[in-house]
Regions:
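Conserved helicase motor core of SF1/SF2 NTP-dependent helicases
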Residues: 2-21, 38-40, 123-130, 148-155, ...
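Coupling/switch/interface segments within P-loop NTPase motor domains and analogous charged loops
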Residues: 26-33, 46-136, 273, 285
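Membrane-lumen/periplasm interface segments of specific transmembrane helices
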Residues: 42-45, 49, 231
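Long C-terminal extensions of eukaryotic subunits of large macromolecular complexes
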Residues: 137-140, 151-152
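Distinct, well-ordered alpha-helical segments
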Residues: 142-145
Length: 410
C-alpha cells in the first residue's frame, strides 16, 4: 500500500534471489512486487488514456462547497464513505445504506439532494484531465459491471496476492478483483487498519467466509513483545479473539519510560540509543524511533547528530534508502509492514492522531483506529521495545498501554 514498503521490498529482494522486482521502464509489464497504486494505475491508464489519476487530492468550484446541504462535509461523505465503499445512487438514496462508523452530520436525511450535488462534483471532475484516483476507479467499475468495458487480457493475472488488504478501500479491491482470472489471496490484520476502518469485504464483491485461515505463529517478535501486544490488542473493540499468535523466542522485557516533558523523553531516548550501540553492539540501522504525531522528531534528530554523531531520516523521505547506515524515523502509519530489531516508540500526544484524517468517523471508530495505530507500532519490534510517554497523559489508548507495561514489569 505504502511506497515505503516498495522501497523495503526492493532492498530485500536481492537477499531472496529476486531480480528486477520492479520494472520501472515498462509499467504495463508484469511485476513480481508492486504497490496497489502501481497496479491500479496501469488499469486506469489503459481504460482512460487521457486521464491522469491523482491520489493526493482534488479541486472543485467553490459554489458546490457552499450551496450543498452538507457544506464542506460533503467532501468527507464522498471521500470517506461513498467512493471507498462503492456506494451507488440507489443504495444511498432509496435503500438508505447505513453509514456505519461515520460521524452523524446535519441534513444527512436529505440524501437525494446530497447525491445531486455529488453528481455535480462528478460532472466537474469529468471535465478535467487530472482526476481523483478513487473516483476514476469508481466510474471504471461501473463501466465494467455494466458491460461497457473489458480489462485487456495482458493486464489480467491468474493469481494476485494482496498484502495488508485492510488498508485498501472496497472500491480498489473490487477493481483489482476484476483483473484476476482464478484466485485472489488477501493477507490482512484487522487490528492494523490505520488508514480507514477495516474493509467491508462484501462491498468489494469478495466472499471470505469459507476461505479464512488464521495465522497463529509470530515469527517476528519475542515472547515478551508478543505478550504485551496481545494484551493491548484485547483492549481494541471487536478484536479477533480467534487469532492468538504464539512466539518461540525469548527477549528482554518491554520497558516503559514516563517523563514530565519532551526534553526528558528525548534525553532518555538518546541514552537508550547510546546503550544499544555502545554496549549491546547494535548498528544504527537496527534502530527505529516511531512517533505518534508525525514531524515531532526533528529536534531529536539534531540531538542524535550533535550528541552521538548519528544520522537519522524518516523512512518515507524520498531520499531515504534502506541500505543507509542511519537510524530510522517513522510515524505510526508509514511504519506499516516494516520490522526493526529495536523500536523506541514515542507516544507523546493522543490528540495528534486527529491529523491522520479520522475526524469524519464517530468516537467509537476513532478510538479503535487510535488503538490500531499503537498496536501496529509496538508490533514492528523484533527484539527490543521501549515505550516513552508523558506522565500526565489522560488519553485512554495510551494509559491502557501504560497499565499493561506497569503490570508486566512488577
Amino acid at each position: 500500500f505504502k511506497p515505503t514498503l516498495k522501497k523495503y521490498n526492493k532492498y530485500i529482494a536481492p537477499f531472496l534471489n529476486i531480480k528486477n522486482p520492479f520494472d520501472e521502464e515498462n509499467p504495463l509489464e508484469e511485476k513480481i512486487i508492486g504497490t496497489s497504486k502501481d497496479y491500479v494505475n496501469k488499469i486506469l491508464r489503459a481504460a482512460f488514456p487521457d486521464i491522469i489519476p491523482d491520489s493526493t487530492g482534488y479541486s472543485i468550484r467553490e459554489e458546490i462547497d457552499k450551496e450543498n446541504p452538507l457544506g464542506p462535509n460533503i467532501w468527507r461523505e464522498l471521500d470517506s464513505f461513498i467512493l471507498p465503499n462503492f456506494v451507488t445512487e440507489k443504495e444511498y438514496c432509496e435503500e438508505k445504506i447505513s453509514r456505519v462508523g461515520m460521524k452523524k452530520i446535519k441534513n444527512s436525511d436529505e440524501r437525494k439532494s446530497i447525491w445531486d450535488y455529488i453528481e455535480n462534483i462528478f460532472t466537474e471532475w469529468d471535465k478535467e484531465n487530472i482526476q481523483y484516483t478513487e473516483y476514476v476507479c469508481y466510474k471504471l467499475i461501473q463501466k465494467i459491471e455494466n458491460g461497457e468495458y473489458k480489462i485487456p487480457e495482458k493486464l489480467k493475472t491468474d493469481y494476485l496476492l494482496v498484502d495488508d488488504a485492510q488498508d485498501l478501500s472496497a472500491t480498489t479491491l473490487r477493481l483489482m478483483r476484476a483483473t484476476v482470472r482464478k484466485s485472489m489471496i488477501l493477507t490482512y490484520d484487522k487490528e492494523q487498519a490505520v488508514f480507514q476502518p477495516s474493509c467491508i469485504w462484501n462491498r468489494a464483491g469478495i466472499d471470505i467466509s469459507r476461505n479464512l485461515i488464521n495465522l497463529n505463529i509470530n515469527f517476528r517478535s519475542t515472547n515478551q513483545i508478543n505478550e504485551v501486544a496481545e494484551k493491548y490488542r484485547a483492549t481494541i473493540k471487536g478484536a479477533n479473539k480467534e487469532n492468538l499468535p504464539k512466539t518461540f523466542r525469548l527477549g528482554p522485557p518491554v520497558e516503559l519510560h514516563e517523563n514530565k516533558n519532551q526534553d526528558d523523553s528525548f534525553a532518555q531516548m538518546i541514552s537508550t540509543v547510546r546503550m544499544c550501540i555502545n554496549s549491546l553492539n547494535y548498528k544504527p540501522e537496527d534502530i527505529c524511533i516511531i512517533e505518534s504525531s508525525y514531524g515531532d522528531l526533528s529536534e531529536l534528530s539534531e540531538k542524535l547528530k550533535n550528541e552521538l554523531d548519528l544520522d537519522s531520516a524518516y523512512v518515507d523521505d524520498s531520499e531515504f534508502d534502506f541500505s543507509d547506515i542511519i537510524i530510522r524515523l517513522a510515524g505510526t502509519q508509514n511504519c506499516k509492514g516494516l520490522d526493526f530489531p529495536i523500536v523506541l516508540f514515542y507516544l507523546n500526544d493522543f490528540t495528534s492522531f486527529s491529523q491522520f484524517g479520522i475526524k469524519q468517523f464517530d468516537n467509537a471508530t476513532i478510538d479503535i483506529m487510535n488503538r490500531n495505530m499503537i498496536y501496529t507500532a509496538i508490533t514492528r519490534s523484533i527484539e527490543m521495545l521501549h515505550v516513552f510517554t508523558l506522565s500526565d497523559s489522560t488519553a485512554a489508548p495510551i494509559n491502557d498501554l501504560k497499565a499493561i507495561l506497569k503490570t508486566e514489569t512488577k
